[in-house]
Amino acid sequence: MNAALIIIFGVLLLSIFLGIRAQKGKDMNLEQWTVGGRGFGTVFVFLLMAGEIYTTFTFLGGSGWAYGKGGPAFYIIAYGCLAYILSYWLLPAVWTYAKQHKLMSQSDFFTKKYNSPLLGILVSLVGIAALIPYLVLQLKGLGLIVSETSYGKITPTAAIWIGAVSITVYVMVSGIHGSAWISVVKDIMILVVVLFLGVYLPIHYYGGFQDMFQQIETAKPGFLTLPESGQSVAWFSSTVLLTALGFYMWPHTFSASYSAENPKVFRKNAIIMPLYQLVLLFVLFVGFAAILQVPDLNGADGDLSLLRLSLQAFDPWFVGIIGAAGLLTALVPGSMILMSASTLFAKNVYKVIAPRTTEQQVSALAKFLVPVIALISVYFTFKGGNTIVTLLLMGYSLVTQLFPALLFSLLKHNMVTKQGAFAGIIAGVGAVTYITMTETTIGTLFPALPQAAKDLNVGIVALLLNITVMMAVSLMTRKAKSAAADQAA
C-alpha cells in the first residue's frame, strides 16, 4: 500500500466517523435529518452550500473544459457570480416563507404556494430526474479521482462502490448534520489544494502565467478566446444566464437554504461566495497548464487533465492529499443529493398518494430509499459515457424549468395559476428531454437565423416555451374561473 492510498483511506474513514458522530445528542426526526432543525449559522450554511456547489466538477469538469475547450470554460466562473447576486434577494424570501409554514423540501414550497399537491409531485419528479445525473457525475468523478491518485491500486469500479456505500451509511444515520461537518474538512482541503495547484503548476512548467498563456496561444492560436461561431459570445451569455437561473433550483441546494437560523445569513453569504468562486479560476489554470504537458487527452479523457498533470509533477504523498480532497468533493454533495432525492419521493410523492402516512413512516421510508437511489445512480454511472460538464448541463436544463413558477410565486400578486405553472413545467421539461435525446440545437431548429442566434444555448427555447405556455394557460384558467364566478353570482 503506497502513501497516496493510506492518505485517501485515512480521510475517507475520518469523513465516515465525522458523518456518523454528527447525529450524537440529537433527536433525528425528519426535520433534524433534512434541514438540521433550522439552526445553522452563517459559517455552517456557507460551508454546506459551498460543499454542494463545489463538487467533483470543481476538480475535474472545470479543468477538463479548460483543457479541451479553452476560452469558453470561463463561463464556469461567470454564472456562479450572477447566481449569488440573485440569491441576495431570492433566498431570504424563500427562507421566510419556508419557516412560516415549516416546509422541509423544495416541493413543499411549490405545493404550498400554489395550493396544489399535484404540482408538488411534478416538482419532485423533475427534481429527482435532475438529481440522478448529478449524483452520477459525483460517482463518476469519484471513480476517476481515487483510481488515478491511487496509481491504479483501486479500480474506478471499486472506488465508486466504496464511495456509494460510505455516503449511504452516514446519510442514513446523520442526514444533513453529517454533510455539514464533513464540509468543514472538505472546504479546508480543497482551498489549500486547488490554490496551490493553480499557482504552482503554471510556474513549475512555464515560469509564470503570462508565459503559459503565450505558449498556448502560439501552439493553438485563438484557443483561449471565444470562437466566432459555436461556443461564441452568444452561447457564453445565454449559458451563463440559464445556469445562473438554475443555480438554486437544485432540490438539495434549495432545501439547504431552509437550514439557516435567519435570513441575514444569506445576505452575508451572497457577499462572501463570489470570492470563493475565484477558487474555480485556479482550477482552470491547472487545465490550461496541462494542455502542452499532457497532450492527446481526447473527449471525456479531458476530465483527467488535472490528475494526470499532478501524477507527473508530485510525489505519492501529495498525490494522496489531492485524491483525498477530490474524494470529499464527491462525498459532500453526493450525500445532500441522496438525502434530497429520498425525501422528495417519500414526503412529496408517496405521502401525497397515501395521505394517512405518519411522519415517522415518511422518515423511515426516506432513509430506506437512500440505498435504493444510490444503487440506481451506481448503475447509471457504469452505463453512461458522458463527460462531467455534459452531465451537469443536462441536470441544469431540467431544474431551470422550475424557476419561472418560483419567481412568480414570490410576487405580491401572482398572476400564474397552478394549472399554468404545471403546464409550463411540463412543456419546458418535455422540450429539454427532446433536445437532449436528439442533440438538437437552435441552428438545426431554425437554420435561417443569423449565426449569433443559432449559437444561443438551446435551453433558451425550452425556457421560453415554458414561460409562454405558463402564461397562456394561466390566462385561460383565470378567465374560466372568472366566468364561473360570474355565472354563480
From Swiss-Prot:
CDD domains: SLC5sbd. It comes from the Bacteria. Its main location: membrane. It is found in: Cell membrane. Keywords: Cell membrane, Membrane, Symport, Transmembrane, Transmembrane helix, Transport. It holds the Pfam family SSF. One of its GO terms (cellular component) is plasma membrane. GO terms for molecular function: symporter activity; transmembrane transporter activity. PROSITE patterns: NA_SOLUT_SYMP_3. The keyword Zinc does not apply. Belongs to the sodium:solute symporter (SSF) (TC 2.A.21) family. This is Uncharacterized symporter YhjB.
